[in-house]
């Protein structure tokens, strides 16, 4: 019981910290309707699955949230089957998500270390990594750029993986 709850909570917080931040602006339509629908569908599937996972531990809360957008009871809802989840993730590359989360974390870390707000603008994020990783990253590059509030993201292939974040200058320091 405790281990199941611990793993579900860990996934929930990781999802909120990383994925939700990566797709938030796209879900609101920053890159058009098709991109927004794609992000919203992924978020909807994840919320539905998370509610089912949390239902045994938080029965009343999950039932209430479920009723806001679904009919019936979360406790009687079928689990998503493996083929549904595979189909939903068919175009996704787990490496792309991992790269996006890693690079967004580097941008956040740079802002925190400089005592800046997470909304502080970034001039450029320079990413160097292997060919397979940089190719995977291309599919989430715009999500990372928007989430980090970066003007640009440059990607180069190299043997040593690195992420360098250059924050924008303080407009009041001038």
Model region roles, listed by residue range:
Residues 1-174:
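Feature 926 captures the class I aminoacyl-tRNA synthetase adenylation module centered on the KMSKS loop
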């Amino acid at each position: 019981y405790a281990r199941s709850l611990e793993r579900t909570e860990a996934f929930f917080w990781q999802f909120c910290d990383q994925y939700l931040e990566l797709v938030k602006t796209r879900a609101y339509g920053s890159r058009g309707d098709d991109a927004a629908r794609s992000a919203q569908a992924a978020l909807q599937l994840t919320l539905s699955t998370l509610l089912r996972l949390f239902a045994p531990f938080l029965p009343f809360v999950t039932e209430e949230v479920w009723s806001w957008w679904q009919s019936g009871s979360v406790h009687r809802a079928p689990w998503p089957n493996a083929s549904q989840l595979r189909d939903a993730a068919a175009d996704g590359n787990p490496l792309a998500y991992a790269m996006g989360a890693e690079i967004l974390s580097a941008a956040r870390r740079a802002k925190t270390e400089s005592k800046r707000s997470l909304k502080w603008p970034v001039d450029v994020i320079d990413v160097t990594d292997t060919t397979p990783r940089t190719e995977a990253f291309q599919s989430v590059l715009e999500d990372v750029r928007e989430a980090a509030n970066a003007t640009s993201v440059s990607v180069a292939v190299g043997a040593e993986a690195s992420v360098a974040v250059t924050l924008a200058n303080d407009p009041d320091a001038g």
